[in-house]
């Protein structure tokens, strides 16, 4: 049992995170130099995301009997994303108004370092609904894969899958080649994931070494408030959705525990995307559903980011004594319903969307972003973890709604049961 524990990715990543925290705390300069380890691991994951999405979506769509099912799956997924992300925004808005973590800080926006957020503000100006929609269409297929733009690759994969399906038996050879290529890609993923402990160690050592645990104290109330809100959202909101769907949120979290630890170490939910595609299929969700819901969710179903955006915006208002009446907060909510859909599941994207939102609302000082610039990195873990769990739950829910969920398989896997009813440890 001890040997299997030490060999498990779960144990290795958890140990690596702990060592990274200790190194960053006691030897901050050395810890800060570990950044390339974390960056290298994330780059390796990003290298493989585009081909994984392409293969999964193409084989999933081309293998379906009816194309109407694909459209129905997409429509149901977008409806679910909109409802749940709106709930996340509202919950963040309610809790930050009740707790008021920024009240009493009395910060003068004129004294803040506006230059510190100038880069984010400049990037935020490029955000917009039209620009976002136009960006979904790649300039070239090669460009989409080269840049690793998830939505661009997804669009091409959907079109390719439709075209391959229309070829019928003539396209069988291409289908077989892509399916075989998919197996090779997942083999590469398994090799890359062996480096997850090193990546998690480097990323955590850098974070603690550069920013220090002490930097958490001054704005700790906002951080604690945000983490508690994310936990409540997962347990109460997603837990209720899971229960109605027919599974336990706690058993589901246990099932994806390794992916959660990888995300905890890297602060990017995107780092677990390839494994989530594989694990959700093993959980009983049809490949075509997994291939559509998971990648799309990384732009349209970021529950943790939604909570963060409302809480951070109102926190800045409270800290700078910028009064926000009910009209201003409703305006903020409406703007966030649109701008939050442009956030990708990568580290730092939430901060850029926040800058875009504050600029769009106009009532809040953009310089106020400097207040949370230093602690944004510490809140990204909770954002990424919540995003990952949210997209996993969404996949199961959508699969059930479109009748593409194997309920028996779902129950067997989450309860560590073999198909014959015997209980045993199912590898994750």
UniProtKB/Swiss-Prot annotation:
MF-aspect GO terms: fumarate transmembrane transporter activity; malate:proton symporter activity; succinate transmembrane transporter activity
UniProt cross-references to InterPro entries, sorted A to Z: C4_dicarb_transport (IPR023954), Na-dicarboxylate_symporter (IPR001991), Na-dicarboxylate_symporter_CS (IPR018107), Na:dicarbo_symporter_sf (IPR036458)
GO cellular component: plasma membrane
Keyword Transmembrane helix: yes
Pfam families: SDF
Subcellular location(s) per record: Cell inner membrane
Species this chain originates from: Salmonella typhimurium (strain LT2 / SGSC1412 / ATCC 700720)
Top-level lineage group: Bacteria
Membrane topology type: Multi-pass membrane protein
Role this protein plays: Responsible for the transport of dicarboxylates such as succinate, fumarate, and malate from the periplasm across the inner membrane.
Keywords of the record: Cell inner membrane, Cell membrane, Membrane, Symport, Transmembrane, Transmembrane helix, Transport
Main location: membrane
GO biological process: L-aspartate transmembrane transport
Transmembrane portions of the chain: 5-27, 47-64, 77-99, 141-163, 184-206, 216-238, 289-311, 326-348, 353-375
Coiled-coil portions: none
Protein name per Swiss-Prot or TrEMBL: Aerobic C4-dicarboxylate transport protein
Family: Belongs to the dicarboxylate/amino acid:cation symporter (DAACS) (TC 2.A.23) family.
């Amino acid at each position: 049992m001890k040997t299997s524990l030490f060999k498990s990715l779960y144990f290795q990543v958890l140990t690596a995170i702990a060592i990274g925290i200790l190194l960053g705390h006691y030897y901050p300069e050395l810890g800060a130099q570990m950044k390339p380890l974390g960056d290298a691991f994330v780059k390796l994951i990003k290298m493989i995301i585009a081909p994984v999405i392409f293969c999964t979506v193409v084989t999933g769509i081309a293998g379906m009997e009816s194309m109407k099912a694909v459209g129905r799956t997409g429509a149901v997924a977008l409806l679910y994303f909109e409802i749940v992300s709106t709930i996340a925004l509202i919950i963040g808005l309610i809790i930050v108004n009740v707790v008021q973590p920024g009240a009493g800080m009395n910060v003068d926006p004129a004294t803040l370092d506006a230059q510190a957020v100038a880069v984010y503000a400049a990037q935020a100006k490029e955000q917009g609904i039209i620009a976002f929609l136009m960006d979904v269409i790649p300039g070239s297929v090669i460009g989409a894969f080269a840049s690793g733009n998830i939505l661009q690759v997804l669009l091409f994969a959907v079109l390719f899958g439709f075209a391959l399906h229309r070829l019928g038996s003539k396209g069988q050879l291409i289908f077989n080649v892509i399916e075989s290529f998919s197996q090779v890609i997942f083999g590469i993923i398994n090799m890359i994931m062996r480096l997850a402990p090193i990546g998690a160690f480097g990323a955590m050592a850098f974070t603690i070494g550069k920013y220090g645990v002490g930097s958490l104290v001054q704005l700790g109330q906002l951080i604690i408030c945000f983490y508690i809100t994310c936990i409540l959202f997962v347990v109460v909101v997603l837990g209720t959705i899971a229960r109605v769907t027919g599974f336990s949120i706690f058993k589901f979290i246990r099932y994806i525990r390794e992916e959660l630890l990888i995300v905890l170490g890297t602060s990017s939910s995107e780092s677990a995307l390839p494994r989530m595609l594989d694990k959700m299929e093993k959980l009983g969700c049809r490949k075509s559903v997994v291939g559509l819901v998971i990648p799309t969710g990384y732009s349209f179903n970021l529950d943790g980011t939604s909570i963060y955006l409302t809480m951070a915006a109102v926190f800045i208002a409270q800290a700078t004594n910028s009064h926000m009446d009910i009209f201003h907060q409703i305006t903020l909510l409406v703007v966030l319903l649109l701008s939050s859909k442009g956030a990708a599941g990568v580290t730092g994207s939430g901060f850029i969307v926040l800058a875009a939102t504050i600029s769009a609302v106009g009532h809040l000082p953009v310089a106020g972003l400097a207040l949370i610039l230093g602690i944004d990195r510490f809140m990204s873990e909770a954002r990424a973890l919540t995003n990952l769990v949210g997209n996993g739950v969404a996949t199961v829910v959508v699969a059930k709604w479109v009748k593409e969920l194997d309920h028996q398989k779902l129950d067997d896997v989450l309860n560590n049961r073999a198909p014959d009813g015997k209980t045993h440890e199912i590898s994750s």
